[in-house]
Design a protein with these regions (language model features):
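Active-site neighborhood of phospho(di)ester-bond hydrolases with catalytic His/Asp-centered motifs
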Residues: 22-25, 64-65, 107-108, 135, ...
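Active-site gating/metal-coordination segments in enzymes
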Residues: 76-182
Length: 308
């Protein structure tokens, strides 16, 4: 199946004659513990290695999203002393980011359903290398916003992030391996129940509110947000999207139209994990396959997140 990789490039415009620099808003490093949990046999990637890959692609800065949440995946073999392991993995990310603090910004991560999640968020909020934001992965954590208990827990997590002034980048699509429900209904729950708890912070929906593709469920969910933006719903005032997503050749025009409906000013670049076939240079090479106009490219490429 022919697929077109959509990647939105955000350029940070410096004053004067200095050329704009690319910022990657959806990047990961993986500890020796998280690496093989995420990808069998993989040792992970360090910040030194990421910087080298960024240099190759002429990426100036990146938001590094901790993958500590993967240690708390309910469908993976249990990790010994999980709570401590999650803390240590976030700390590993903090140390890695600190080595290149001029180019990397770290986001803490947790499984929001775990009883220690809020405690770990509060700890991260005091860490200068992680306090900018929080990464949540509803699919990996098997979050179901249609489950009242899950929703109650999520509202607390969003409230605490708002109190700590930590931006949230969230993979909101439900677990695909178990075919959890996801679409317009779940997007409305997110809009109506969760965004009000995070009214004062930036919330970024990863993968244009999908799981990486632009299937029917993602089309439905993203349409809910596009409609809310069109009617100037105050709940989406601080809502943004990273465009780290694939589409079939027939879906690509629809995806471009959705970007236009959302508004290019709300789109950030994101390349995801630097694995074979998806290194930063590969991601950039695919960018111009996507059908946007020169003006749209220019506008998207100059977006800068409020938390920078």
């Amino acid at each position: 199946m022919v697929r077109v990789r959509l990647l939105a490039i955000v350029l940070f415009a410096f004053p004067g004659l200095i050329p704009a620099q690319i910022i990657d808003y959806h990047q990961h490093i993986y500890s020796p513990v998280a690496g093989p949990i995420s990808i069998a046999g993989w040792r992970g990637v360090t910040s030194d290695e990421l910087i080298a890959l960024m240099n190759e692609a002429h990426i100036s800065r990146a938001v590094v999203l901790s993958t500590a949440y993967s240690l708390a995946n309910p469908h993976k073999p249990p990790v010994a002393n999980e709570r401590e392991a999650v803390r240590k993995d976030n700390e590993w990310t903090s140390v890695q980011v600190a080595k290149h603090a001029d180019r990397l910004i770290g986001f803490c991560s947790v499984n929001p359903l775990k009883p220690y999640a809020i405690e770990e968020m509060n700890r991260c909020a005091k860490d200068p290398n992680l306090r900018t934001g929080l990464k949540l992965h509803f699919g990996n954590s098997d979050v179901d916003v249609d489950n009242p208990a899950h929703l109650t827990r999520l509202k607390k997590v969003f409230h605490v992030a708002n109190r700590n002034r930590m931006a949230i980048l969230v993979h909101a699509h439900a677990n695909v391996n178990f075919n959890r429900p996801y679409g317009a209904r779940e997007a409305r729950v997110f809009l109506e129940q969760l965004l009000p708890e995070a009214a004062d912070i930036v919330v970024v929906l990863a993968h244009l509110a999908g799981a990486g593709g632009f299937d029917e469920s993602t089309q439905q969910a993203s349409a809910v947000y596009a409609e809310a933006i069109a009617r100037h719903d105050p709940r989406v005032r601080n809502l943004y999207f990273d465009a780290c997503v694939s589409a079939t050749a027939s879906e690509a025009p629809m995806l471009a139209q959705r970007i236009r409906e959302i508004g290019v000013s709300r789109i950030f670049y994101g390349s995801d994990a630097p694995v074979k076939g998806n290194l930063p240079v590969d991601a950039l090479a695919r960018w111009h396959a996507f059908p946007l106009s020169a003006d749209e490219f220019h506008s998207i490429e100059r977006n800068v997140a409020p938390f920078f």
